[in-house]
Design a protein with these regions (language model features):
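Flexible, glycine-rich linker and terminal segments associated
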Residues: 1-34, 39-42, 145-180, 184-191, ...
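Outer membrane beta-barrel translocator domains of Type V secretion systems
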Residues: 3-117
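Transmembrane beta-strand segments that form the barrel wall of outer-membrane beta-barrel proteins
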Residues: 38-50, 74-84, 107-117, 127, ...
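Feature captures outer-membrane beta-barrel proteins of Gram-negative bacteria and organelles
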Residues: 58-71, 89-103, 125-142, 161-172, ...
């Protein structure tokens, strides 16, 4: 899904979100129980890493996944979100299809999406593909700038075309863990281009607490090592199954992944 990816400056951004109101659980449960929504999440958090330099330290995101059609093997959905951070508000509208095989060991998916930044009026379309198993996950997204150069707050900004790919190897440790490689490239058609390669490790060391470490390299071969910690409390958590640690046993056999 392209919704979480930001071109250029937000490529390496990692946020620590702190729950603001656990009473919202009840609101989400009621909506999900009475509508085709399969997932509804409202996140209110703080910029614990000081990434926002404009003075707005709160990140807010509302995300919903709406079931459009579902069979034993196929799931057609709409994913819509609106997020506000760094004094910018972005709306995303996406549609996707996922297919799972009869053994529930392989998921293949495609999606298309549209991004609109409310303040600058930048627009972007895109599409993505994904292949998911219990051992490996592969995702790729293509982004197409719709808006050209726009003057926003006295600065000329140009939307970027680009792509990213991510390959993830799942590990049998902690509550979940993985190693991954991600490559991205964005350009404006006038000679500007930004590239980034990233290798990393992530581990959910406690329920909803994930740590990560990664090395990033840009097109000038400048390397940077970053560490992060992420804490999240999913809305409606009282209806979710209790998480259990993995057994640490390696296996080359594909396991059912429908719960993903």
């Amino acid at each position: 899904d392209g919704n979480a990816e930001e071109a250029a400056k937000n490529e390496a951004a990692t946020y620590s979100l702190n729950a603001a109101n656990s009473a919202l659980d009840d609101v989400e449960d009621n909506i999900v129980a009475t509508t085709p929504f399969t997932h509804l999440e409202l996140s209110l958090g703080s910029d614990a890493f000081g990434l926002d330099t404009t003075g707005t330290t709160t990140k807010t995101e509302l995300l919903g996944v709406l079931r459009l059609h579902e069979t034993k093997n196929t799931f057609v959905f709409n994913q819509t979100s609106i997020s506000s951070f760094d004094s910018r508000t972005t709306a995303n509208l996406g549609f996707g299809v996922r297919h799972i095989n009869d053994d529930e060991t392989v998921i293949m998916g495609v999606n298309a999406f549209y991004d609109y930044e409310l303040d600058s009026e930048h627009k972007r379309t895109g599409f993505g593909v994904e292949l998911l198993t219990s051992l490996l996950e592969m995702r790729a997204n293509k982004y197409n700038a719709v808006s050209g150069t726009i003057t926003h707050d006295g600065i000329n900004e140009t939307a970027l075309d680009g792509h990213d790919i991510k390959i993830t190897g799942n590990l049998p440790y902690f509550y979940s863990s993985n190693i991954y490689f991600k490559q991205s490239e964005f350009k404006d058609g006038a000679g500007y281009k930004t590239e980034n390669d990233e290798w990393g490790f992530e581990a959910e060391i406690a329920p909803n607490v994930t740590i990560g470490i990664a090395q990033q390299k840009d097109g000038n071969n400048t390397k940077d090592t970053v560490a992060s910690i992420r804490y999240s409390i999913p809305l409606g958590a009282n209806t979710a199954p209790t998480k259990a640690k993995q057994d640490g046993k390696w296996s080359t056999s594909l396991k059912p992944i429908r719960e993903k």
